[in-house]
Amino acid sequence: MSNNTSNKAIPYKIYLHESEMPTHYYNVRADMKKKPAPLVNPATGKPVSFDDLKPVFCDELIEQELNDTDRYIEIPQEIRDFYKMYRPSPLVRAYCLEEKLQTPAKIYYKFEGNNTSGSHKLNSAIAQAYYAKKEGLKGVTTETGAGQWGTALSMACSYFGLDCNVYMVKVSYEQKPFRREVMRTYGASVTPSPSETTEIGKKILSEHPGTTGSLGCAISEAVEAATTTEGYKYVLGSVLNQVLLHQSIIGEEAMAAMKKYDIKPDIIIGCAGGGSNVGGLMSPFMGEKLRGEADYRFIAVEPASCPSLTRGRYAYDFCDTGRVCPMAKMYTLGSGYIPAPNHAGGLRYHGMSPIVSELYHQGEMEAVSYTQTEVFEAARDFARVEGILPAPESSHAIKAAIDEALKCKETGEEKTILFGLTGTGYFDLYAYEKFNDGLMSDYIPSDEEIEASLATLPNIEG
């Protein structure tokens, strides 16, 4: 057996005390010698200014978006008070998984599913709702894929007394009706996207009748709704710098918990859709690496059906299908790319966080992709030994962690692996049913499909 199960110096779960929770967000851009390229205004072709973003975002969030010099940004007390309802989240030693794999590797996961939204998304939702309330807004609009972000934002808006209008990718809206009902219970209105309620929604429906939607399309609708409705601004759950900033609390807590027991991870793994989770988990560790204080190996894991990092191009592209948002330099499959309706709805995004993209481009991190069948096999195996039913998104990281642990089994190396378990899969049982019935299909886009989508990239130097 790989571990002595009777006498463990490291507990199954490491919890920080409330007094040890982070008081500041960590801004990894401050430690990046080559900063992520700026967002570009599609109308002018120039880097966006504060005034360009003001019609769309809250003022303080714009400040955070554009700030690439301050290493630490204080977390307001009101946000910290809310965090205490479900944070600090546990750092779990996966002893049972290690036993099953018979690996000398030591596996840890940071579990972010201990709240009603079922994921890490609440970390940024409460921050964005706080700044919207502080600005005196009536409400906010947003998009959601699998529904975790929409659920998190509906909770945050309910807490601060804000309206919450959610555009939910149609395939998830249909597959996950109960996620929709959680949002409605918290007072949100939920619209399947693309819809007939916005001009861009009507356009996409006319061009792609019967489409199951995409995150890029839902973003376009949410932005249009915000900019055409008095007293509303747009907020989003991934991709942008401000979101990765808020999510840095995951990595900060993980690092503090590990240091309590003198644990140093060799490999840090996160699933990657828009980059909020992998960016949040890795950023404090990446900061140490960039400052030359420590060395780590970082792995971003994405679905083979939406392989932005592993098969995309590093270029300026629109963040949304309707091309109403600023352009970002990122790894992208093209803003018109609509992936096959796989079950990891939260990873069905054509692009990637500019921060994650730049770090990947510099060779500071790696990326791998998996088909959904092999991801669900890992999810099942994990659930059976660790007692948590993982979200499909999180299960991409589980699969990569298992693969790395099995490599250690072959080599005999005692590496320490840390991965992000972003949330639970209780609302993803339609997907689990397909997997259990042997009806799950794996779709991998052809080179021709990806090239056709990339051919529509805007011609912007950068």
Regions found by a protein language model. Name each.
Residues Y72-E74, I204-Q242, I250, D262, ...:
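Active-site/ligand-binding loops adjacent to catalytic centers
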